[in-house]
A protein has these predicted regions:
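Ligand-binding cleft/hinge of the Venus flytrap
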Residues: 48-56, 131-166
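C-terminal motif of bacterial Sec signal peptides marking the signal peptidase cleavage site
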Residues: 18-21
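Pocket-flanking alpha-helical
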Residues: 45, 65-98, 176-181, 197-201
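Bacterial N-terminal signal peptides that target proteins for export
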Residues: 1-8
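Short, well-ordered beta-strand elements
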Residues: 27-40, 48, 57-62, 137-141
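A conserved helix-loop-strand patch within extracytoplasmic ligand-binding domains
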Residues: 98-146
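Short helix-initiation/N-cap motifs at beta->coil->alpha
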Residues: 38-39, 60-72, 167-177
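Ligand-binding pocket segment of bilobal, Venus flytrap-like solute-binding proteins
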Residues: 79-82, 149-201
């Protein structure tokens, strides 16, 4: 049974993409895959690693934040990144580096980002957040600062006049905070996205 719900889908019908650095001739049996510390990215990356290794490739995994990932791919220091949220969430990175990257395909169509609360929380929309500021301690628990969802949440705070502070953390820290709050039946609002395993717990 799901224990959380999305109260504000800031972007709907996003596409999760894979891209590679331009100019790869495909002859090398070595490949480096960059990934951010997000659950779906870790899963996809390790699955890809196993598949590449089964095909005889020597695979190197590179964990980093988004800005270094895009820089590394554009400079051919890494070959593949499988967790690009388009068209809006990572738009700025694609504008900056897109001419040096090659999109090779969609992984998931219909991705969403937004704000997430436990299902026992009695609000159902972003407009209701200010009225319950004290119960949420005036905080939205986010992930790493360079993530597109953080920029989108900052914009939502302005657009909806939310009297909240967006807290920077990480994907694992955000889900740990969510679990801790659910275990205590505390009110919490976090940045969230689908697909993500937290919606299936």
């Amino acid at each position: 049974m799901n224990k959380i719900k999305m109260i504000a889908a800031m972007f709907i019908a996003g596409i999760l993409l894979t891209f590679v650095s331009c100019g790869d001739n495909g002859k090398s049996k070595k490949i480096s895959i960059a990934y951010a510390n997000w659950s779906e990215g870790i899963a996809m990356t390790n699955l890809a690693k196993a598949i590449f290794e089964d095909q005889g490739y020597d695979v190197k995994l590179l964990n980093a934040d988004l800005a270094p990932i895009f820089t590394s791919i554009s400079r051919k220091k890494a070959d593949v990144f499988m967790d690009v949220w388009m068209p809006v969430t990572m738009e700025d990175y694609m504008k900056q580096y897109g001419d040096k990257l090659e999109v090779i395909g969609d992984i998931y169509d219909g991705a969403r980002i937004g704000l997430v609360v436990p299902d026992y929380v009695t609000i159902n929309s972003i407009e209701e957040l200010n009225a319950e500021k004290e119960r949420f301690s005036g905080q939205i628990v986010g992930i790493d600062a360079g993530a597109g969802i953080m920029k989108a949440t900052d914009q939502a705070i302005k657009d909806y006049g939310l009297d909240y502070k967006l807290m920077t953390s990480s994907g694992p820290a955000m889900t740990a905070s969510l679990k801790k709050a659910i275990d205590k039946k505390d009110w919490i609002v976090v940045t969230g996205w689908t697909p993500h395993w937290m919606f299936d717990r």
